[in-house]
């Protein structure tokens, strides 16, 4: 791998834009989450995918965590429909996809439609078929058929406060090059920055050029932080605590799957497509509850030596009152009683009570944004 010019996953950055006339086509409605992923396919964030998975690729992803041709891919990107709708779309061939507002999204070139076992598929992707798992629950609620085929993007959503920070891989690669970065570390997040996260990011760029903070914007589980809160907190943190030209912020518009180890690989692939040479993989990356071993997302990278991006594995960071620094269990001999750390539940309880946590947990500027927001959490 050439760190200064990392290849997209699969060797080619996909770009699929529609230049024809879509008027008069059959139409099909898709969710906002699926509309976001269609845009991700079109822009190459999901390279090498050019559309929704066909049956051979879908089954290969479930069984092997790879596409049918052997290319690493761990999360199925699919379009579900009921039997009648799937048959109609397949018969039409080219179908105009519309989001819930009726806006044009893309043309789907439908190639096949096929059934799938939702419970078995969920067990493969999530390592469990427990309906209490948010990803499993989502898959079990899907319709019974899948439609495979390439897509071509017709139109994009209007710019919003959140979308102003969305960037395509072409844009991020240009931005990194313009900054003079040859090594770029990706930081995946679905939370506002704890000071420990900030220190972890800064540790990772001590010997690298810059960090790309890339929060997930899209559907998450109840109790997670709202998208606008996460973005505003990061903007404030970068403004006050980062040297110039060492950190860039860009939003990734997709939903959290909570697929643990498989999603860690997916996160790495997307960030490689953005042009990142490294990705931070923390404890229980993309996990939820107690479904995954805390370091399973580290070990899974052993099964994917062909990825171009390099994972940086970190245990949990915390502030130690004895060490007088931010550290981790590998470097600190002191017990839990000396550590400034807080669980997600305890942090949410504090915020709901209108109280700010210790400055060793959240920067004052970050805490203020959260406390002043009328609805910092997803209902």
Curated annotation (Swiss-Prot):
Entry keyword Transferase: yes
Keyword Transmembrane helix: no
Record InterPro entries: ATP-Sase_PUA-like_dom, PUA-like_sf, Rossmann-like_a/b/a_fold, SO4_adenylyltransferase_pro, Sulfurylase_cat_dom, Sulphate_adenylyltransferase
Catalytic activity line of the entry: sulfate + ATP + H(+) = adenosine 5'-phosphosulfate + diphosphate
UniProt KW keywords: ATP-binding, Nucleotide-binding, Nucleotidyltransferase, Transferase
Domain of life: Archaea
E.C. code: 2.7.7.4
Pathway the protein takes part in: Sulfur metabolism; hydrogen sulfide biosynthesis; sulfite from sulfate: step 1/3
Gene Ontology MF terms: ATP binding; sulfate adenylyltransferase (ATP) activity
Pfam families (alphabetical): ATP-sulfurylase, PUA_2
GO biological process: hydrogen sulfide biosynthetic process; sulfate assimilation
NCBIfam families: PRK04149.1, sopT
Family listed: Belongs to the sulfate adenylyltransferase family.
HAMAP family referenced in this protein's UniProt entry, alphabetically: Sulf_adenylyltr
Name of this protein: Sulfate adenylyltransferase
Species of provenance: Cenarchaeum symbiosum (strain A)
